[in-house]
Amino acid sequence: MLLSKDRNIVVPQEELDRQMEFCGLVHTVLETRLDGRRPLAYVHTFGCQGNVADSERLKGLLEKMGFGFTEEPENADISLFNTCAVREHAEDRLFGNVGALKKIKEKNPDFKIILCGCMMQQERIAEKIQKSYPFVDIVFGTHAAHKFPELLYRALSTGKRVFDIENSDGVIAEDLPLHRDSTFKAWLPIMYGCNNFCTYCIVPYVRGRERSRSSDIIISEARELVRSGYKEITLLGQNVNSYGNDREGEMNFASLLREINNIDGDFIIRFMTSHPKDCTHELLDTMAQCEKVAKHLHLPVQCGNDRVLKAMNRGYTAEKYLSLLEYARSVMPELSVTSDIIVGFPGETYEEFLDTVKLIEKAQYTSLYTFIFSPREGTRAAKMDDPVSREEKGKWFSELCAAQEKIAAARTSAMVGREYRVLCESKAKKDGYISGRTQGNIIIEFPADESVIGSFRTVRVTEALIWMLKGELAD
């Protein structure tokens, strides 16, 4: 169902102005309490790139409230964890980290502990924190992030715990202050939420339904990023291929890519994530025709067996998926494809798992993100019968990884001797070496001075190491 032009899912400017007033109030309170010392915040982000982008906005609000940042929670006045709900492992890690903060709180009662993000949108998690973690001060979900200044002010001024995990389809908050972690790589969210309801996935329940940002705003932000010297812009959405479907009269994702590609400047465009059922020939043709769009496609297949794909509610067959890859490579022979795979979905047999092994051999992925199925409470898959043991699934997982290693080794070995345009990103672990990425999103390390960081250089591949490359400057 299309949103009507009159439906308002954007946070009103009056509300944003109100939150800016709370930023000032927090600044005043802390300035008095700390005798003029600048308060420090420790921010830790779990999960996906969308969470990283959200944290940049939360850090922007913190800066507006007068905060600086520290890498050590012991030195901080507040500690903020932006959480992930996708896998059980993230939940275990979070509570392990939160428990460690209790000692800091005991030494410094004014130290504030804040939990936010996807995991906090789950009612059972909020209840667990309320009952078992009384030293946590503020909890808010994904739909209340723009109200962070108000929530912090309430906690500071009353000394009481503050919880805000309202359930809604979500909103879009534009024009929030932003603290970017990089000066040359930028995350640019184009939409939020998801309408797909894959049976194993909690995201639609914690992120809400799909909400596309205005293309005018996105293009304007991209233009400003290029003007500011950014060399890589990654467009973010749970399913970028659905962009515009919820806004009457809005352009689709392929058209948005073309518009950003037409911005003058030397930069590359990446995007994630694409859902195979919505990945069209139009989009693949657009990727091929737009010289600034990186020839890298992350296209999560999740499984290679049709019965399991149907149980996952993925909306495509293995044959349709492979046909899509065949077309993609016909228009982009240099395309690098990566994917996600879940091993041991409830009811999956070993024979069905072998269909996934066969699929990756046909797909020839550059790399894979593989996970053993992790049930998430509230999803349909969590209620499905799951007779295969974790130990047995672990054996399947190892078999899949071994098969992918051979594929990746062959693909990277074929790159030796060739030259690639690389964005130089950071110092490598080895002294005198720089780490960068090819357009195909493969890490390559090479000897160079730190002055090249943030620039494009041509690098010749001299050695392949399965998941990464070594090289030398060729320009």
Feature annotation, model-predicted:
Residues G237, T273, V301-C303, S339-V343, ...:
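Active-site proximal loops enriched in glycine and acidic residues that flank catalytic Cys/His/Asp
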Residues D110-L115, R124, R227-Y350, E361:
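Conserved SAM/AdoMet-binding glycine-rich loop
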Residues D181-F184, C194-N196, V293, C303, ...:
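Short flexible coil/turn linkers enriched for glycine and charged/polar residues
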Residues C48, G244-N261, G265, M312, ...:
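Radical SAM enzyme [4Fe-4S]-AdoMet core and its adjacent flexible, acidic
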Residues C198, I218, L235, F271, ...:
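Conserved, mostly hydrophobic/aromatic
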Residues K5-I9, K383-D475:
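Terminal RNA-binding accessory module
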Residues M1-Y243, E282, L297, E319-S330, ...:
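Proteins enriched for Cys/Gly/acidic motifs involved in redox and nucleic-acid/cofactor modification
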Residues H146, N196, N241, D306-R307, ...:
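Glycine-centered loop/turn positions within well-structured domains
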